């Protein structure tokens, strides 16, 4: 599979010029003739490199404000010409073979992401000549190397040095695959953007435009193959976005432990996204994609101790997420106390990693610190289709709550209500969360009946000897009947936070008043399926 091809002539035309001068210098130093266009040619000439403008090579000038510059037979014939088969016709038409094409495309995604981007701006940033050259070179990878990523520059020069100025077929094939992936992603962005504008062109409201395109094109890059999927008979892999804009499990670096499983990744995502909701030092422990213990504290050790107390049994073999650096004291507490599958935090101290290294199977991930949450899309696969929605980034503050009962909540009840409301957002529906003094004391998850979730939360608290009296309870959706309030009151809950919106709200509020419970309406639901 060697089939080496020497690189004697290269065409360089890039929008992102990072590293291009150094790459061109390396090519030129190895005797490669340089062809280039527009701004790339000017930059290389300014750096003293011998470069031929494509317009001089073709004898045809750039025109139409640069719209037409590489669409010429002398360019595409040089790229597509099959060595040993098309030599005679290339010589007849004075077409020189081009052995390498270095191209990246107009910044369409960056253009349309700018506030106030007009349709005209978007149109002018649709690259035509670039993708055409990329596809031509990729098609003829048997003879031509196509380079679309600056991260490949160094490896290409090294291989040329190792092969007397040549590249192997295996390398050219790999570069061709990257090229087709690159143009596919580029065309997908364009199709998605214009597809989302179809409603406006049909006279529909502005709100209807810019939401979801009529054809959804998705591009994800494989990060790793999994040993198996959710179950051992299922094959699986982990794919990530090319440009992840927020610290996440997709951006995380594994600094210790055996390979992550499918379920590890799913559970780690659930834990990390939950802990991001808190500004104070916080810990979230997750089992089977549900929080089983959450707390905030004076330190992450304090938060971990309190989160663990919610449900030590379920915490065994769980995933632990922090919103502060993992320190040695906390690492020691975890390793001494329980078996843990994954620990994820923005960072981990060297001392902490020395401690966790004693348990080689423990996976430790660092994801970097996060800032503002980034809007995006959530997907749910159904047989034959895909459900798409905005990420649930909704959250209410104290000033947005409505007190609907006779009794007002105390300051501590209010703090606990807001705390458990944040947790309930990440618990599978029907979700009920009991909290007291900024820690969960009982969680009822995934029940078909809301009242049973409330009962389970109370049972969990009782099993761990945690006092429910004076606690707050969050429900991810409204109570359809008063029975959930009666169950909470029986357990000792004194404050309830819920969306409201049931046709029996009056009945539910009356039940709260009967029990002396303060009730807050959020007017926002957090179903999670």
From Swiss-Prot:
Residues 1-148 form the MGS-like domain. Its EC number is 2.1.2.3, 3.5.4.10. SUPFAM superfamilies: Cytidine deaminase-like, Methylglyoxal synthase-like. Pathway: Purine metabolism; IMP biosynthesis via de novo pathway; 5-formamido-1-(5-phospho-D-ribosyl)imidazole-4-carboxamide from 5-amino-1-(5-phospho-D-ribosyl)imidazole-4-carboxamide (10-formyl THF route): step 1/1; Purine metabolism; IMP biosynthesis via de novo pathway; IMP from 5-formamido-1-(5-phospho-D-ribosyl)imidazole-4-carboxamide: step 1/1. Keywords: Acetylation, Hydrolase, Multifunctional enzyme, Purine biosynthesis, Transferase. Coiled coil: none annotated. One of its GO terms (biological process) is 'de novo' IMP biosynthetic process. GO terms for cellular component: cytosol. Pfam families: AICARFT_IMPCHas, MGS. InterPro entries: AICAR_Tfase_dup_dom_sf, Cytidine_deaminase-like, MGS-like_dom, MGS-like_dom_sf, PurH-like. It catalyses: (6R)-10-formyltetrahydrofolate + 5-amino-1-(5-phospho-beta-D-ribosyl)imidazole-4-carboxamide = 5-formamido-1-(5-phospho-D-ribosyl)imidazole-4-carboxamide + (6S)-5,6,7,8-tetrahydrofolate; IMP + H2O = 5-formamido-1-(5-phospho-D-ribosyl)imidazole-4-carboxamide. It comes from the Bacteria. The IMP cyclohydrolase activity resides in the N-terminal region. Belongs to the PurH family. HAMAP family: PurH. NCBIfam families: PRK00881.1 (NF002049), purH (TIGR00355). This is Bifunctional purine biosynthesis protein PurH. It comes from Shigella boydii serotype 18 (strain CDC 3083-94 / BS512).
